[in-house]
């Protein structure tokens, strides 16, 4: 009798008010936001962003509202849809009301149901040596639609744009710093560079952060459905902002407060790497001996850290949310092999500083 009553209750719950339709509640989707735990650092909020994506309004294959949904699902705080100015293969399917601002406007409307920071932007697209440049925080992307790419950049800069040099190793797998880039950097007209793009990283470009003063980024450059491209967490740029707002993000980018995150590899300047590692990893002395200490290391982030103790190539993996024990000799160097400061250079501190 009880079983029959329970079955009737479940059946009643699963049915719509009518008799001819049956709803299966186990099939009803309600995907939540997958938070990415990366702590704030002293004085700043840590925001997670993707500053290079595409939709159907250039050569992407999804509507801009899906880019907003994906970014929210994946725990991002910031999203820029940066359509190619010069390459719009689907243009014939749209009417004359569509321009270079349309994707941003649709994303902004879709974001009313979310709480992302939507950055207006566009991608100025040329072959090397010029390459591809994103203009971020633009007020009218149509002003970039001119024949001369240098004039396009000037028009964007006149709007207060931040210029990001995209995928310097694409399409020839060579990261070449051409004279045109050196001149633009010297004039303060290129501000950042993608250390990571899609599933690639560019080790040569790691050194450009210190050598040329560029700010590091890692972005998805997604064109298709993002779940079909990345087997794990999408690339993202960490932004250390004074406040969670569009103006806060803009101020942080122009100040250069960024780190790139590709897979579990962080890259950028030591002044932001050091405080982030300090907040992510908690070192607690478990045993204090004459010549060494045993530490309990707790990873309070969603980044997997690889720690090298001394020069013995003894690697300790600190997985997200886990605590590991490790013996460290007093005065020994501790190197974080997933924290990149340059090509072949990693963030390292002495045991006495732990």
Task: Go through each PLM region and give its residues.
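Conserved catalytic scaffold of divalent metal-dependent phosphoesterases
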Residues: 168-170
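Charged catalytic cores and adjacent phosphate/nucleic-acid-binding surfaces used
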Residues: 15-49, 68, 131-138, 173-354
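Bacterial N-terminal signal peptides
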Residues: 2-12
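A metal-dependent hydrolase metal-coordination microenvironment
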Residues: 26-160, 166, 175, 188, ...
């Amino acid at each position: 009798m009880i079983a029959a009553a329970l079955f009737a209750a479940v059946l009643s719950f699963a049915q719509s008010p009518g008799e001819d339709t049956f709803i299966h509640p186990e099939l009803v989707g309600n995907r939540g936001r997958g938070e990415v735990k990366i702590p704030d650092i002293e004085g700043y909020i840590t925001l997670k962003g993707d500053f290079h994506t595409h939709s159907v309004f250039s050569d992407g294959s999804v509507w801009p509202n899906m880019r907003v949904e994906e970014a929210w699902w994946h725990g991002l705080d910031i999203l820029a849809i940066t359509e190619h100015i010069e390459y719009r293969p689907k243009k014939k399917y749209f009417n004359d009301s569509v321009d270079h601002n349309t994707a941003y406007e649709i994303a902004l409307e879709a974001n009313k149901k979310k709480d992302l920071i939507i950055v207006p932007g566009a991608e100025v697209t040329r072959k090397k040596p010029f390459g591809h440049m994103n203009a971020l925080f633009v007020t009218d992307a149509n002003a970039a639609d001119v024949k001369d790419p240098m004039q396009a950049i000037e028009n964007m800069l006149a709007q207060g744009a931040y210029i990001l040099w995209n995928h310097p190793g694409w399409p020839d797998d060579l990261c070449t710093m051409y004279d045109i880039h050196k001149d633009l950097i010297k004039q303060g007209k290129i501000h950042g560079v993608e250390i990571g793009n899609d599933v690639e990283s560019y080790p040569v470009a790691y050194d450009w952060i210190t050598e040329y003063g560029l700010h590091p980024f890692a972005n998805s450059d997604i064109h298709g459905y993002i779940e079909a491209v990345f087997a794990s967490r999408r690339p993202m740029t960490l932004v250390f902002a004074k406040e969670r707002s569009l103006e806060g993000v803009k101020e942080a980018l122009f100040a250069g407060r960024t780190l790139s995150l590709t897979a579990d590899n962080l890259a950028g300047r030591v002044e932001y790497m050091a405080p982030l590692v300090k907040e992510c990893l908690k070192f607690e002395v478990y045993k204090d001996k004459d010549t060494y200490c045993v530490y309990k290391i707790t990873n309070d982030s969603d980044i997997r850290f690889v720690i090298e103790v001394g020069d013995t190539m003894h690697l300790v993996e600190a997985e997200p949310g886990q605590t590991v024990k490790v013996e460290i000799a007093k005065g020994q160097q501790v190197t974080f092999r997933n924290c990149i400061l340059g090509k072949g250079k990693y963030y390292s501190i002495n045991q006495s500083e732990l």
